[in-house]
Amino acid sequence: MSSESDSPTPQTPPAQPAASQPKADSPLMEGIKTIGLSVVLALGIRTFVAEARYIPSESMLPTLEVNDRLIVEKISYHFNPPRRGDIIVFHPTEALKQQNPSLNEAFIKRVIGLPGETVQVTGGRVLINGQPLEENYIQSPPDYQWGPEKVPADSFLVLGDNRNNSYDSHFWGYVPRQNIIGRAVVRFWPVNRLGELGPPPSY
């Protein structure tokens, strides 16, 4: 009689492979992903929220000087129309393009006339519906005569603060609301002039 047990010998179950770990990206790939995400976020902010702009000319003296850097916000005009005194950045109008077909740079001017208002420039003053506009921010009183004209619906009359050296609405007409990019809110350069841009004028 055999001394060994007749019961079957237990079998060791085969080893199960360990769960595979996701392969870590190389430092180069991580860097590319980070840069890509940063670019997407920057483009989104620039398109929908705000962007930086610089001043290329003297047309907004003394408020804005050549090479000033500004932040232009793009959100508020989706909810409220521009106000008198806002400093806006806008795409060239059709009238501007007709005068200069190669023109594609954005303009920056101050909103003076609102839709439905009658505007006149006479005697060195701007009149809104016959009432003089108080303007303590202009370089010098305008030396030209213009109007009276009624501002069309959904359009704005804009003038440079340097009234006698500004290519603005008194040359080429009104800015449709759809052309407006946004409102200049803060000057961030040069640092000695950093701050919010001034309140709107009154009359």
UniProtKB/Swiss-Prot annotation:
Subcellular location: Cell membrane
Chain intervals with Low complexity compositional bias: 17-26
Superkingdom assignment: Bacteria
Catalyzed reactions per annotation: Cleavage of hydrophobic, N-terminal signal or leader sequences from secreted and periplasmic proteins
Residues the record marks as active site: S59, K109
Disordered, as annotated region: 1-26
Cellular component per GO, a single term: plasma membrane
Keywords, ordered alphabetically: Cell membrane, Hydrolase, Membrane, Protease, Transmembrane, Transmembrane helix
Signal peptide positions on this chain: none
Protein name per its UniProtKB record: Signal peptidase I
Native species: Leptolyngbya laminosa
Gene name as annotated: lepB
